[in-house]
């Protein structure tokens, strides 16, 4: 698996996307210099000097994922898929001191979303029945559905919805490699304006709420998912929980996190990259939003660190 491929130009994005930007005019060198200037102007921060942050920015600029994050401040379908399907040990241990290795192998939120992806797949596999219709919104590469086992599930139909045409093209390619082309239909559409009224048995959604700070908008998103499901249908979604520094209600299990990796994560995503996914919600907030959208039988499956819970909810019969 290549971890450094895909030029920035080949990952052009679409207007209206909230997870990653669309500006490709600035050269990599100019972008890095702009980041350097911002870091110098901000000065030292607790636990890190300007010089240390400049060196981390340079390290980010040396590999594909880092360059994408510096430019877009979020993840697209390709890099999300790379992170969640990465097999630990793919990067050799001789690279252990590199930032790329640390990001793929050590950062707590990366480990949490990879664990979350595994939870999604196991839950979705259990929910699949012959003849069912399942949707992924936004679908990205649609790995949580396309990587399932359909050998004993005749008649299952799969729907992918995304605003990003690159994501849809990549999902189509993955469906072909999995021998699922005939089962899959792909639609370029806004998640808040789904045209799937009461036609889906299972709907999977990861990532969109992380980029939406407006709680009302997230509730509206859950309403759209509710309306897309048939009565009795199931939503499988997720959310990021707040760190202890931001909320006394933080559920994080600090015993399951590496303190050094956690400090590096905060420095990278908050200070250097200024990541757009810094929208956190508690289990209680998520329960309230889903209930307002009409869902019942809400239950949570936490990752070990309790950073990226999976939540499963039903549309009433």
For each predicted feature, which ranges?
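C-terminal alpha-helical "lid/dimerization" subdomain adjacent to the S-adenosyl-L-methionine
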Residues: 236-293, 298-300
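A short glycine-rich, Lys/Arg-flanked "PGG" loop and its adjoining helix->strand segment in the class I
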Residues: 218-231
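Conserved SAM-binding loop
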Residues: 171-172
């Amino acid at each position: 698996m290549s971890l450094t491929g895909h030029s920035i130009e080949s990952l052009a994005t679409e207007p209206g996307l909230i997870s990653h930007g669309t500006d490709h005019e600035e050269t990599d060198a100019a972008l890095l210099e702009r980041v350097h200037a911002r870091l110098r102007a901000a000065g030292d921060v607790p636990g890190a000097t300007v010089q240390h942050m400049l060196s981390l920015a340079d390290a980010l600029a040396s590999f594909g994922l880092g360059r994408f994050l510096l430019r877009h401040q979020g993840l697209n379908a390709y890099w999300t898929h790379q992170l969640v399907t990465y097999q630990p040990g793919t990067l050799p241990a001789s690279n252990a001191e590199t930032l790329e290795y640390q990001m793929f192998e050590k950062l707590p939120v990366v480990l949490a979303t990879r664990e979350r992806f595994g939870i999604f797949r196991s839950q979705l596999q259990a929910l699949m029945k012959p003849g069912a219709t399942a949707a992924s919104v936004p679908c990205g590469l649609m790995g949580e559905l396309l990587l399932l086992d359909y050998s004993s599930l005749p008649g299952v139909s799969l729907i992918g919805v995304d605003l990003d045409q690159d994501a849809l093209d990549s999902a189509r390619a993955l469906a072909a490699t999995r021998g699922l082309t005939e089962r899959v239909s792909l639609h370029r559409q806004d998640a808040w304006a789904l045209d799937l009224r009461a036609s889906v048995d299972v709907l999977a959604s990861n990532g969109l709420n992380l980029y939406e700070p407006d709680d009302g908008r997230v509730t509206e998103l859950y309403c759209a998912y509710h309306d897309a499901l048939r009565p009795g249908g199931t939503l499988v979604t997720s959310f990021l929980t707040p760190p202890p520094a931001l909320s006394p209600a933080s559920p994080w299990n600090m015993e399951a996190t590496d303190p050094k990796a956690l400090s590096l994560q905060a420095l990278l995503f908050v200070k250097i990259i200024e990541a757009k996914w810094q929208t956190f919600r508690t289990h209680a907030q998520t329960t309230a939003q889903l209930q307002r959208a009409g869902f019942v039988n809400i239950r949570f499956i936490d990752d070990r660190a309790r950073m990226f819970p999976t939540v499963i909810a039903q549309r009433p019969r």
